[in-house]
Protein backbone atom coordinates (compact mmCIF):
# COMPACT_ATOMS: atom_id res chain seq x y z
CA UNK A 1 0.00 0.00 0.00
CA UNK A 2 1.20 3.38 -0.88
CA UNK A 3 0.82 6.51 1.23
CA UNK A 4 -1.18 8.17 -1.52
CA UNK A 5 -4.04 5.63 -1.24
CA UNK A 6 -5.13 6.72 2.25
CA UNK A 7 -6.40 10.24 2.53
CA UNK A 8 -7.37 11.79 5.81
CA UNK A 9 -10.75 13.44 5.84
CA UNK A 10 -12.34 15.53 8.53
CA UNK A 11 -15.19 13.94 10.46
CA UNK A 12 -18.68 14.91 9.46
CA UNK A 13 -19.91 17.96 11.35
CA UNK A 14 -23.24 16.90 12.84
CA UNK A 15 -23.80 20.11 14.83
CA UNK A 16 -26.51 21.31 12.42
CA UNK A 17 -28.42 18.05 12.83
CA UNK A 18 -28.49 18.49 16.61
CA UNK A 19 -29.57 22.13 16.26
CA UNK A 20 -32.45 21.13 13.97
CA UNK A 21 -33.48 18.32 16.34
CA UNK A 22 -33.39 20.66 19.34
CA UNK A 23 -35.40 23.38 17.59
CA UNK A 24 -37.92 20.80 16.38
CA UNK A 25 -38.34 19.41 19.89
CA UNK A 26 -38.78 22.93 21.29
CA UNK A 27 -41.37 23.81 18.63
CA UNK A 28 -43.32 20.60 19.21
CA UNK A 29 -43.22 21.12 22.99
CA UNK A 30 -44.42 24.72 22.73
CA UNK A 31 -47.21 23.74 20.33
CA UNK A 32 -48.32 20.93 22.64
CA UNK A 33 -48.31 23.11 25.75
CA UNK A 34 -50.14 26.02 24.12
CA UNK A 35 -52.80 23.91 22.40
CA UNK A 36 -53.96 21.83 25.36
CA UNK A 37 -56.86 22.89 27.52
CA UNK A 38 -56.13 23.27 31.24
CA UNK A 39 -59.66 24.36 32.11
CA UNK A 40 -61.62 22.09 34.43
CA UNK A 41 -64.37 19.99 32.88
CA UNK A 42 -67.64 21.60 33.89
CA UNK A 43 -70.99 20.27 32.83
CA UNK A 44 -72.30 16.87 31.93
CA UNK A 45 -71.66 14.49 29.04
CA UNK A 46 -73.68 16.65 26.62
CA UNK A 47 -73.16 20.24 27.80
CA UNK A 48 -69.67 21.59 28.42
CA UNK A 49 -69.35 25.04 30.00
CA UNK A 50 -65.62 25.47 30.82
CA UNK A 51 -65.85 29.28 31.05
CA UNK A 52 -69.04 29.28 33.08
CA UNK A 53 -72.50 30.04 31.86
CA UNK A 54 -76.08 28.89 31.93
CA UNK A 55 -78.07 26.30 30.02
CA UNK A 56 -81.77 25.59 30.19
CA UNK A 57 -83.94 23.15 28.28
CA UNK A 58 -87.27 21.50 29.03
CA UNK A 59 -86.00 19.13 31.71
CA UNK A 60 -82.81 20.64 33.04
CA UNK A 61 -81.36 24.00 34.12
CA UNK A 62 -77.60 24.38 34.65
CA UNK A 63 -75.72 27.41 36.00
CA UNK A 64 -71.92 27.27 36.35
CA UNK A 65 -69.67 30.09 37.56
CA UNK A 66 -66.44 30.92 35.79
CA UNK A 67 -63.27 29.25 37.17
CA UNK A 68 -62.04 32.38 39.03
CA UNK A 69 -65.41 33.63 40.23
CA UNK A 70 -65.13 35.48 43.54
CA UNK A 71 -61.39 36.22 43.50
CA UNK A 72 -61.50 39.26 41.26
CA UNK A 73 -61.33 41.87 44.02
CA UNK A 74 -59.05 40.15 46.52
CA UNK A 75 -55.30 40.42 46.92
CA UNK A 76 -54.93 36.85 45.70
CA UNK A 77 -54.93 38.26 42.18
CA UNK A 78 -51.38 37.88 40.82
CA UNK A 79 -50.97 41.47 39.65
CA UNK A 80 -52.15 42.97 42.94
CA UNK A 81 -49.99 40.63 45.01
CA UNK A 82 -46.88 41.38 42.93
CA UNK A 83 -47.55 45.12 43.17
CA UNK A 84 -48.00 44.84 46.95
CA UNK A 85 -44.70 42.94 47.35
CA UNK A 86 -42.78 45.47 45.23
CA UNK A 87 -44.33 48.39 47.14
CA UNK A 88 -43.58 46.80 50.52
CA UNK A 89 -39.95 46.07 49.61
CA UNK A 90 -39.49 49.60 48.27
CA UNK A 91 -40.87 51.11 51.47
CA UNK A 92 -38.66 48.86 53.62
CA UNK A 93 -35.54 49.84 51.68
CA UNK A 94 -36.42 53.54 51.83
CA UNK A 95 -37.22 53.34 55.55
CA UNK A 96 -34.01 51.52 56.44
CA UNK A 97 -32.00 54.08 54.49
CA UNK A 98 -33.73 57.04 56.16
CA UNK A 99 -33.35 55.58 59.65
CA UNK A 100 -29.61 54.98 59.35
CA UNK A 101 -27.71 58.02 60.66
CA UNK A 102 -24.21 56.65 60.05
CA UNK A 103 -21.67 58.04 57.63
CA UNK A 104 -20.92 55.82 54.67
CA UNK A 105 -17.63 55.38 52.84
CA UNK A 106 -18.13 56.22 49.18
CA UNK A 107 -16.34 54.51 46.30
CA UNK A 108 -14.34 57.72 45.82
CA UNK A 109 -12.81 57.24 49.29
CA UNK A 110 -14.61 60.13 51.06
CA UNK A 111 -17.07 59.94 53.93
CA UNK A 112 -20.46 61.28 52.90
CA UNK A 113 -23.52 61.74 55.06
CA UNK A 114 -26.48 59.57 54.08
CA UNK A 115 -28.85 62.58 54.20
Curated annotation (Swiss-Prot):
UniProtKB keywords: Host endoplasmic reticulum, Host membrane, Membrane, Transmembrane, Transmembrane helix, Transport, Viral movement protein
Annotated GO CC locations: host cell endoplasmic reticulum membrane; membrane
Domain of life: Viruses
Intervals, Lumenal compartment: 35-74
Transmembrane segments annotated in the record for this chain: 14-34, 75-95
Protein's GO biological process: transport of virus in host, cell to cell
Membrane topology, Cytoplasmic segments: 1-13, 96-115
Cellular localization per UniProt: Host endoplasmic reticulum membrane
Signal peptide range in chain numbering: none
Alphabetized Pfam families for the sequence: Plant_vir_prot
Function: Plays a role in viral cell-to-cell propagation, by facilitating genome transport to neighboring plant cells through plasmosdesmata,.
Similarity remark: Belongs to the Tymovirales TGBp2 protein family.
Extra information: TGBp1, TGBp2 and TGBp3 seem to act together for cell-to-cell propagation. TGBp1 is the main movement protein that physically cross the plasmodesma with the viral genome. TGBp2 and TGBp3 would facilitate TGBp1 function.
Protein name: Movement protein TGB2
Amino acid sequence: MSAQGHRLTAPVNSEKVYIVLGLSFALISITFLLSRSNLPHVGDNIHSLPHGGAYRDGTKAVLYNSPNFGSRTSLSNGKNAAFAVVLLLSLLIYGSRCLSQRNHLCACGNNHSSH
